[in-house]
């Protein structure tokens, strides 16, 4: 007589216990868990039971559904965002989560499409809906003026998106930058002149001619020439351009922790300098750096008489 094998069915697990265990796992791994992690932790639970529990948690707004290079991720939902996304479907929640993860640098719709694997028409519909709810906003990037990046509505865009103080409506404020250049250099020149007039020994004169970036920043703020609030980082950017022009030199010294203008126990000091050798006229003229110099000749398609760079240089 043949032996009869009887398949023993595991006892049905309580759905609430499964959901609670998944929530516990999500708290253990705040960056998200995969289905494989859930399966490893609960090997006796069948795939269908896991799917039912996960879908229920998603529908109740307790989990966020994310996509990564390794596949789908389940992450515990932020309690603050749970109320905002009430009534939204899973696709809308997914797009919102992708935008949230992008932070204040934002994300293009093309990248949202890649991460969500949703059709572009569906993404555009979701984006308009989220914008109408004031959950997200579209911001034009200075890196690509015809493209918009999306970020959460309450975020201040990163400097890499707006261009910082040097841009207004995606236009580079060259005149404003030039004025700041002149004023920063003037301040350092006056500092150096005061040091020379002190008639002290050369070493003391040299040390007295230096100014910290905080001093320069304070001077510019007191002048009131900027309509936007400038940071020390903005002023250091201007000072760096003066260094590249050979008008200023920088040194870094050790500073006591907490000293105004110091960062991580170091302080940047700047002073105005005179060029050792005056630059030649060829370096100043656009011809010295022109990439089509070899093709330029009178009567040709490229010639000095119709050169826009030469015209601008002569007018300047």
From Swiss-Prot:
Transmembrane domains' residue ranges: none
GO molecular function: double-stranded DNA binding; iron-sulfur cluster binding; metal ion binding
Localization: Nucleus
Residues the record lists as binding [4Fe-4S] cluster: 287, 290, 296, 307
SUPFAM superfamilies linked to this entry: Winged helix' DNA-binding domain
One GO term (biological process): transcription by RNA polymerase III
Disulfide bonds: none
Cellular component, GO, one term: RNA polymerase III complex
Cross-link Glycyl lysine isopeptide (Lys-Gly) (interchain with G-Cter in SUMO2): residue positions: 5, 7
Function: DNA-dependent RNA polymerase catalyzes the transcription of DNA into RNA using the four ribonucleoside triphosphates as substrates. Specific peripheric component of RNA polymerase III (Pol III) which synthesizes small non-coding RNAs including 5S rRNA, snRNAs, tRNAs and miRNAs from at least 500 distinct genomic loci. Part of POLR3C/RPC3-POLR3F/RPC6-POLR3G/RPC7 heterotrimer that coordinates the dynamics of Pol III stalk and clamp modules during the transition from apo to elongation state.
Assembly mode: Component of the RNA polymerase III complex consisting of 17 subunits: a ten-subunit horseshoe-shaped catalytic core composed of POLR3A/RPC1, POLR3B/RPC2, POLR1C/RPAC1, POLR1D/RPAC2, POLR3K/RPC10, POLR2E/RPABC1, POLR2F/RPABC2, POLR2H/RPABC3, POLR2K/RPABC4 and POLR2L/RPABC5; a mobile stalk composed of two subunits POLR3H/RPC8 and CRCP/RPC9, protruding from the core and functioning primarily in transcription initiation; and additional subunits homologous to general transcription factors of the RNA polymerase II machinery, POLR3C/RPC3-POLR3F/RPC6-POLR3G/RPC7 heterotrimer required for transcription initiation and POLR3D/RPC4-POLR3E/RPC5 heterodimer involved in both transcription initiation and termination.
Family label: Belongs to the eukaryotic RPC34/RPC39 RNA polymerase subunit family.
Domain notes: The [4FE-4S] cluster-binding domain adopts a globular structure that serves as an interaction hub that connects the POLR3C/RPC3-POLR3F/RPC6-POLR3G/RPC7 heterotrimer to the Pol III core.
Protein name, UniProt field: DNA-directed RNA polymerase III subunit RPC6
Provenance organism: Bos taurus
